């Protein structure tokens, strides 16, 4: 299968996501439900962030959770990292997590977004 020259990352309305974050969270024993609730409570906050194009709170295993979020550019990613959810995560990390969150900056090669 051949791909076009860069058009793979084009989404409807010319809105593109180019960069993302993948955050892995390991809950302390007995804190799994609290981590889940934390992720659920983060959704309304990120919905108010104009540069957060996509945001997912996910469960990877019984005590392993994650966040995947995507942005049109580095400025959007930095705004999110300086925002309320990131601040709340760092404030709760010692209480809820077995180790500090693993935050990976990633590049989005291709995406399909609703629209």
Regions flagged by a language model, labelled:
Residues 26-35:
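Short, surface-exposed ligand-recognition loops at beta-strand->loop->(often short) alpha-helix junctions
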Residues 41-54, 70-104:
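An amphipathic, aromatic/His-enriched active-site/gating alpha helix that lines ligand/cofactor pockets
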Residues 31, 63, 76:
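Short phosphate-engaging motifs
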Residues 34-37, 79:
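Short, solvent-exposed alpha-helical surface patches in well-structured domains
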Residues 19-21:
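Hydrophobic core residues within well-ordered beta-strands of beta-rich domains
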Residues 2-17, 26, 53-63, 89-115:
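Glycine-rich beta-strand-turn "strand-cap" elements at beta-sheet edges
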Residues 24-26, 68-70:
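Short hydrophobic/aromatic beta-strand micro-patches
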